Regions:
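Surface-exposed, charge/polar-rich loops and edge strands
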Residues: 1-378
Length: 378
C-alpha cells in the first residue's frame, strides 16, 4: 500500500542563481524542455514550439491582466503599511493583504501612495476588506506598482510593467502573471496559426496564494486557495472540436489548466477535484461554459478530464503547481526533468524558461478519440 503523499515528495534543490531575475531579451527567446508521452526529455528553444504541435491541436490561454496591485502607505499614527490587493469585489471595494506592525482594525484609515485614504471595513479570513475613495482599478493603475513575485529581488521597473504581462492580457484582475504565456509574442501566435493550431481563452485571476508553499505535511490536509475563473462556451466548444478532430488540448499555464479542469469538475456537480479512486466509467460529457471560485487541488492520482498537455514554467519546490504537473506527467518523470533542468542550467520561475509536457494518457472527456501513444508514466 503506498503511503499518502507528503510535501517532502515535491522538494528539490535549486541553486539560487538559476532563479531568473529578468526576462530574456526577447519574449520567445527562452529555452523549452520537452517531456514527451514516453517520458523522454528533449532540450529545445521556445521558438520551436510550433514544430511540436500539429493541425487541430488547441492551445488554451489565460487572458487575465495583472493589475498594479501593490501600494505603500501609512496609518494615521505614522506606522508603515503595505497593501496588496487580492480581489476587487465592487468598483470601490477590494479584499487585500495588509502588512503592518499591528493589524489595522475596522474603521482604521490608511493613507496610500501619499494621495488617497482607504478605510478598513473588516476582515475576510486573512484578507482585509477595504473601501477606496473611487474606482479601485483606476486608483491602482495611477498609483500602484506591478506586484512582482517574492523571489524577484528588484523593485518593479518600467520593463516589468510590459514584460510581466502577456501580449493577449485583456481582463484585469490578477496579482500574478500566468507566466507560461509570457513567452508568446505576436510572431509566435502567427506561426501557430499558420500550422493550423487553434486557440481559445479562459480567464483565471491569479491570486497571491499561487506563491504559497504547502504548509502542512500531508497533501490531504492542505486547504487550496480560491481563485475566480470563467470558461466561455466558445472555449468549451473549441475543446470538443479539437478532440473530435483528433487534436490535443494543451493548456498554456497551470492557471488555464485549473480553469478547464474546474469547468469539467462542475459537470460532475461539485466543482471540486474528483475522489482519487477508480470510478465507474461514465459516458463522456461535453465541456460546458462555467465560472465561479475554484479550489480545485490537482495532485498525483487525479485523472485529467480535458487536457492532453501543458506549456508551463518551472515551479517552486513544494508548491501546488509542482504537484499539478506531477499529476499530469508522473512524479518520477517530473523529478528527472527538474534534475535535468538544474544540471543544464535552465532559468527558473516566472521570468525563466518553459516546459512542454505531453500527457502519457488521454483525458477522460476525450475518450472518443484514441489515447496518446506510449506507456503511462507512474
Amino acid at each position: 500500500v503506498s503511503s499518502p503523499l507528503s510535501v517532502a515528495d515535491f522538494d528539490y534543490a535549486l541553486p539560487p542563481e538559476l532563479i531568473a531575475q529578468h526576462p530574456s531579451p526577447e519574449r520567445g527567446g527562452s529555452r523549452l524542455l520537452h517531456l514527451d508521452t514516453q517520458g523522454r526529455l528533449h532540450d529545445r528553444m521556445f521558438a520551436d514550439l510550433a514544430g511540436q504541435l500539429r493541425a487541430n491541436d488547441l492551445l488554451v490561454f489565460n487572458d487575465t491582466r495583472v493589475i498594479k496591485a501593490r501600494l505603500a502607505g501609512h496609518k494615521a499614527s505614522g506606522g508603515k503599511v503595505e497593501v496588496l490587493v487580492e480581489r476587487i469585489v465592487e468598483a470601490d471595494r477590494a479584499l487585500a493583504h495588509v502588512r503592518a506592525s499591528k493589524s489595522p482594525g475596522p474603521g482604521t484609515v490608511l493613507r496610500l501612495a501619499d494621495r488617497f485614504d482607504v478605510t478598513v471595513l473588516g476582515r475576510a479570513g486573512a484578507l482585509f476588506d477595504l473601501r477606496f475613495p473611487g474606482d479601485v482599478l483606476d486608483l491602482l493603475q495611477a498609483h500602484g506598482a506591478t506586484p512582482l513575485p517574492p523571489y524577484i529581488t528588484h523593485a518593479a521597473e518600467t520593463e516589468d510593467d510590459e514584460r510581466y504581462q502577456t501580449v493577449y492580457a485583456r481582463a484585469p484582475g490578477a496579482v500574478a502573471a500566468p507566466t507560461a504565456g509570457l513567452h508568446f509574442d505576436e510572431a509566435m501566435m502567427q506561426r501557430l496559426e499558420d500550422v493550423g493550431v487553434a486557440r481559445a481563452f479562459v480567464t483565471l485571476h491569479v491570486g497571491a496564494g499561487t506563491f504559497k508553499p504547502v504548509q502542512v505535511e500531508k497533501l490531504a490536509d492542505h486547504v487550496m486557495h480560491a481563485e475566480w475563473y470563467t470558461v466561455p462556451q466558445a472555449t468549451a466548444d473549441a475543446v470538443a472540436r479539437a478532440h473530435a478532430a483528433g487534436g490535443r488540448v494543451i493548456a498554456v499555464g497551470t492557471t488555464s489548466a485549473r480553469a478547464l479542469e474546474s469547468a469539467a469538475a462542475q459537470l460532475q456537480g461539485d466543482g471540486q477535484a474528483q475522489p482519487q479512486t477508480p470510478q465507474t466509467p461514465q459516458p463522456p460529457q461535453a465541456l460546458r461554459a462555467a465560472q465561479g471560485d475554484t479550489q480545485l487541488f490537482i495532485t498525483p492520482g487525479y485523472r485529467f478530464q480535458v487536457l492532453d498537455g501543458l506549456v508551463t514554467n518551472f515551479h517552486l519546490p513544494q508548491s501546488t503547481l509542482l504537484m499539478m504537473i506531477s499529476a499530469m506527467a508522473g512524479m518520477d518523470p517530473i523529478r528527472r526533468a527538474y534534475a535535468h533542468a538544474v544540471a543544464e542550467r535552465y532559468r527558473f520561475f516566472s521570468y525563466g524558461d518553459a516546459m512542454l509536457i505531453e500527457s502519457p494518457v488521454a483525458p477522460a472527456l476525450a475518450s472518443s478519440h484514441s489515447a496518446a501513444p506510449g506507456p503511462a508514466a507512474v
